[in-house]
Amino acid sequence: MASLTRAVTRLAIAGRQAVRTIATTTPVSGHGDDIMEKWPADKFDNHFINYLNRPEIDGWEVRKALSELHDYDVIPDPKVVEAALRACRRVNDFALAVRFLEAIKIKCGAQKNRDTVYAYIVKQVEPVLKELGIDTPEQLGYGEPEFFVPEPEYWWEKKWYKDYGYDKHPNIQI
């Protein structure tokens, strides 16, 4: 019995020495691009302008750049918007250009900000829009929903009429 115990002990000690411990590394954050948030505004803008102005860019890369730009908590500068619209036109993606303008409008936030910031951006890029033949969502009729009629007795608060500009519509009575 003693020899059996000695054999098991010897195997356990030998096995412990034979097993190599696995070196672990510290987990790295999946957000490697978060450093871009700390860039100065000019460097940030130039990164996207240079990326979107590449002549060999394809549709997937344009979508990737616009998606990445949308992920950051910024409203793009008109220079970046111009580069994005030109890239959309270069790959012949009219719908992406309109959706990009709509995303900028949504990122502007409340109606007050949309009236000032979004209007400023559209005014600045208007020559490029005309040159490329791209319409804004408002020109296409996407400024407000097609079949939306608020029903205040169900869920619509009366103060929202004024916030969203429905107090000026002739068919809606408060």
Curated annotation (Swiss-Prot):
InterPro entries xrefs: Cyt_c_oxidase_su5A/6 (IPR003204), Cyt_c_oxidase_su5A/6_sf (IPR036545)
Localization terms from the record: Mitochondrion inner membrane
GO molecular function: metal ion binding
Pathway the protein contributes to: Energy metabolism; oxidative phosphorylation
Pfam families the UniProt entry points to: COX5A (PF02284)
GO BP of this protein: mitochondrial electron transport, cytochrome c to oxygen
Cellular component aspect of the GO annotation: mitochondrial inner membrane; respiratory chain complex IV
Main location: mitochondrion
Subunit structure: Component of the cytochrome c oxidase (complex IV, CIV), a multisubunit enzyme composed of a catalytic core of 3 subunits and several supernumerary subunits. The complex exists as a monomer or a dimer and forms supercomplexes (SCs) in the inner mitochondrial membrane with ubiquinol-cytochrome c oxidoreductase (cytochrome b-c1 complex, complex III, CIII).
Role description: Component of the cytochrome c oxidase, the last enzyme in the mitochondrial electron transport chain which drives oxidative phosphorylation. The respiratory chain contains 3 multisubunit complexes succinate dehydrogenase (complex II, CII), ubiquinol-cytochrome c oxidoreductase (cytochrome b-c1 complex, complex III, CIII) and cytochrome c oxidase (complex IV, CIV), that cooperate to transfer electrons derived from NADH and succinate to molecular oxygen, creating an electrochemical gradient over the inner membrane that drives transmembrane transport and the ATP synthase.
Name the UniProt record assigns to this protein: Cytochrome c oxidase subunit 5A, mitochondrial
Species whose genome carries this gene: Caenorhabditis elegans
Gene that encodes it: cox-5A
